[in-house]
């Protein structure tokens, strides 16, 4: 399972793409092919995740070349864009997942077990420090004018779900902000972002031990960890389905 750097595929980045041997971060996608070729025993299953921008007209050639090179190695691949909201997580996070199997691929995205989106309140902390309160006058002025619920199209007020969690959550967070009343707003905390990526609090506690923060400061490292992650619930659903497919195949062979 892997997710190569998405920055050059992203619709909000410089859109440099992931052309093989181009030297862009997203071109590291093709390191997967190199690694598989060097392995004595090829993995039965490969899962790749990335931003849906990889399917844009000026980006998708890289994906199709990747799939063709996997096919040349004996893999059959299937791909689909999945939204975390369809797997219980109240975050509008759409990502492409490619599931490749060495030999015939009986995996089906249609058979994944979708779940009702859980209430956002389950993911929010009850007592949040003033450290996370938005104080930038120009942003507050814009928000309180109620102009189309956005700041340059990027700043949104969270209601039933958050938007895409990226590596940088302060300043103008793509994930949105929380309305705390009386014309005041706050950012999502690091813990909330990680919860919205499917991590439980025990895992987050361990991360906080590793990435200790300075007093009265937020942790850019924890925000980055969240933004670079794959939503756990989506990934586990895919893995569970793969295990089911593999088990059925073994039973058929017996």
Task: Go through each PLM region and give its residues.
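Class I S-adenosyl-L-methionine
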Residues: 7-172, 182-186
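N-terminal Rossmann-like NAD(P) cofactor-binding module of classical short-chain dehydrogenase/reductase
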Residues: 1
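Conserved NAD(P)H cofactor-binding loop of Rossmann-fold oxidoreductase domains
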Residues: 4
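C-terminal target-recognition/interaction regions appended to catalytic cores
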Residues: 137-254
């Amino acid at each position: 399972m892997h997710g190569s750097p998405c920055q050059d595929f992203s619709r909000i980045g410089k859109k440099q793409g992931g052309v093989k041997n181009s030297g862009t971060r997203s071109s590291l996608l093709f390191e997967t092919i190199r690694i598989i070729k060097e392995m004595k025993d090829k993995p039965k299953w490969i899962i790749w995740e990335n931003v849906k921008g990889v399917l844009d007209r000026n980006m998708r050639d890289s994906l199709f070349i990747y799939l063709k090179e996997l096919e040349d190695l004996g893999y059959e691949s299937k791909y689909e864009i999945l939204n975390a909201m369809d797997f219980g997580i109240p975050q509008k996070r759409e990502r492409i997942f490619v599931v490749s199997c060495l030999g015939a691929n009986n995996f089906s995205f249609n058979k994944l077990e979708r779940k009702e989106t859980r209430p956002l309140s389950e993911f929010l902390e009850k007592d949040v420090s003033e450290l996370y309160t938005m104080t930038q006058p120009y942003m507050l002025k814009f928000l309180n004018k109620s102009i189309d619920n956005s700041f340059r199209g990027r700043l949104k007020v969270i209601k039933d779900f958050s938007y895409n969690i990226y590596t940088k959550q302060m300043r103008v967070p793509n994930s949105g902000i929380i309305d705390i009343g009386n014309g005041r707003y706050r950012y999502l905390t690091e813990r909330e972002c990680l919860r919205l990526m499917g991590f439980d609090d025990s895992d987050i506690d361990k991360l906080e031990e590793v990435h200790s923060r300075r007093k009265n400061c937020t942790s850019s490292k924890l925000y980055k960890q969240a933004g670079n992650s794959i939503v756990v619930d989506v990934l586990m659903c895919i893995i569970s389905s793969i295990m089911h497919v593999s088990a059925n195949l073994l039973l058929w062979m017996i």
